[in-house]
Design a protein with these regions (language model features):
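Interhelical loop/hinge segments that connect adjacent transmembrane helices in multipass membrane
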Residues: 1-3, 7, 148, 152, ...
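Signature of the first transmembrane helix
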Residues: 5-64, 101, 162, 223-250, ...
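Interfacial segments at transmembrane-helix termini and the short loops linking adjacent helices
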Residues: 38, 107-123, 315-345
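Transmembrane helix-bundle signature of multi-pass secondary active exporters and lipid flippases
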Residues: 48-56, 228, 232, 236, ...
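Hydrophobic alpha-helical transmembrane segments
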Residues: 118-125, 151-202
Length: 369
């Protein structure tokens, strides 16, 4: 009974945490829908998705393998391993952030974006590194089952972002580089304290050979997870670039507006994922296979039930949303909402099986998902 209460408490903290983050993304999206042109909103979603890819790559490269391995280690050894992996993660983040910023800057020049290519590239590069650093802190805290600490850190991130956005609105328009610089500052402020703790926890007597050994251990598990994550990202986000290239960013804005209304489904799925990985890892480590099966089945049924209930409620308030929020420029997007709902129903079941494979350490099969 006590174990169930603890898991329920962590679940609520995780849901609140994801609600904060997704709510922030929702506010940004709604503000762009309401006050910006379709072209601006469409381009923003493409660039933000590219930033998301780098975070996913780092999580699959280090975070997923770290979660799997940590469940099998004693507490003291786990803490040292997580701290050493933090430095590996920071180096990998920099190696991804720098070329990502260069690519964005070059594309901004070639495609004649109405912003400075240098400023846009710098803002994007700094955002990628800062976002990745905070995501690692979240992973490390979840490994230690500190869901409340994660929620507090993300609360700081949300508050700093909102305060900065309010300041920008007071002085004038917000451009894309301003948004990424603001998110960089918010990520740094939120994760600075725990990042400092991780840095000090490694000590000064760690040899390079130890880091190389850790890299080899992580890579032995994560190399297939990286491929699987890239395939998963393409499945979730390739429409941004194909639809933008074929139908234009105006049509892309309609697609994203419909998807934005289903954000609560994403919130629940992400909250479950962050909690399920360490919980399932513990079940596997203790050979509680029957309990694991029940957990997977009940999780799938619960999330699919939520999907149906939310979709029904959404269509009840849909006329009001169109009239008072989206306006005439978006028109009727109900068919797009239904198509997205079908996609999320299938993706929910796929996500459960993906996390199960990751937790087992069976990363190669992820490639075929």
């Amino acid at each position: 009974m006590a174990e169930k209460k603890v898991f329920l408490f962590r679940s609520m903290a995780s849901v609140i945490d994801q609600a904060l983050l997704s709510g922030l993304n929702l506010l940004i999206g709604l503000a762009l829908i309401r006050y910006a042109s379709k072209e601006t909103y469409g381009l923003y979603t493409q660039l933000f998705a590219a930033g998301l890819l780098t975070t996913i790559l780092l999580d699959s490269l280090i975070g997923s393998a770290l979660t799997t391995l940590s469940a099998r280690l004693p507490a003291d050894e786990r803490g040292r391993f997580v701290a050493r992996a933090a430095k590996i993660h920071w180096v990998a983040s920099a190696l991804l952030a720098i070329p990502a910023g260069l690519v964005v800057g070059v594309l901004a020049k070639l495609l004649d974006f109405p912003v400075s290519p240098v400023v846009l590239g710098l803002s994007f590069s700094s955002f990628v590194f800062a976002q990745a650093s905070r995501e690692y802190c979240r992973t490390a805290l979840f490994i230690e089952s500190q869901a409340v600490a994660v929620a507090k850190m993300d609360m700081v991130f949300v508050l700093v972002t909102i305060a900065g956005a309010a300041a920008f609105f007071m002085v004038g328009d917000i451009g894309t580089p301003h948004i990424f610089f603001l998110l960089t500052i918010a990520n740094v402020v939120a994760s600075a304290a725990f990042s400092s703790t991780l840095w000090r926890s490694t000590g000064r007597d760690i040899k390079w050979g130890q880091y190389l050994a850790d890299v080899n251990v992580l890579w032995s598990l994560s190399r297939w997870a990286v491929i699987g994550s890239v395939v998963g990202w393409l499945g979730n986000n390739s429409y941004l670039y194909f639809s933008g290239a074929i139908a234009g960013v105006v049509a892309l804005a309609d697609l994203n507006a419909a998807r934005l209304l289903l954000m609560p489904i994403v919130i629940v799925g992400m909250a479950w994922t962050t909690l399920a990985r360490p919980a399932m890892g513990e079940m596997i480590a203790n050979s509680k296979i029957h309990k694991l099966r029940q957990f997977v089945l009940k999780s799938t049924l619960a999330m699919e039930s939520f999907n149906l209930i939310y979709l029904g409620g959404l269509f009840v308030v849909y006329p009001w949303l169109i009239a008072h929020l989206f306006g005439e420029k978006y028109g009727d997007i109900s068919n797009l909402i239904l198509l997205w709902a079908c996609y999320f129903a299938v993706n929910t079941a796929r996500n459960v099986s993906t996390i199960l494979l990751i937790t087992y350490g069976i990363f190669r099969e992820l490639f075929w998902q």
